[in-house]
Amino acid sequence: MDIRIIIDGMKLNVRVGIMLIKDNKVLLHKNDNRDNYCLPGGGVHFLESSEEAIIREIKEETGLDIKVDECVSTIENLFEHDGIKFHEIYFIYKGTFVDDIDTNKIIENIEGKPIKYGFVDIDKIDDYYILPVVTKDIIKNKTSHIINREIK
C-alpha cells in the first residue's frame, strides 16, 4: 500500500522517480491522458525504502530490471491538482538498466496503463513539459534538494 495520507482534504504522498540515462538520453514517461512528461517511478509503500520502491516500480511497469546508483535529489513538492492540495516528498535516483536497451524504441507499460516510456535527448530537455517543473534542473545536474512551492 502506497504512503498516501489524507488530512483535512489535503494529501501527503511519498513518491520516487529515477533518471535512467544512456547515450545522453533520459527515459521519461507520458500518460496518454495528460500533456506532461515525468520521470518513471511511483509511490513508496509503507515499510519500503525509496530505493526498494523504484526498483519495484520499474519492474512492475516495464518488466525491466534496473541498478540504482544513488539518490540525487529530494523535492518537497507542494501543488494543487484537480482541486486537491498535495504535499509530496519525492526522491529522485540515478541508475541504469541491467540489460542493454535500445534508446530509439518506445517501452510499453505492461500493467495495461495508458503510459508509454521513451528516451529524450538531454540537450533537448527544455522542449518538453516535465512535472515537477524543477525536474529539468535535476536532469541537468543543477540541483539536489528543492522546495517546489506552486501553492501557498
What are these model-predicted stretches?
Residues 1-17:
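Acidic, metal-coordinating catalytic segment for phosphate/diphosphate chemistry
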Residues 5, 36-37, 75-79:
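Short, solvent-exposed loop/turn segments at secondary-structure junctions
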Residues 12, 19, 37, 64, ...:
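Residues that recognize and position ribonucleotide moieties
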Residues 17-19, 25-26, 90-92:
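Residues embedded in well-ordered beta-strands
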Residues 22-60:
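Conserved Nudix-box catalytic region and its N-terminal flanking loop in Nudix hydrolases
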Residues 32-37, 108-152:
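Nudix hydrolase/Nudix homology domain
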Residues 44-67, 77-130:
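Unchanged
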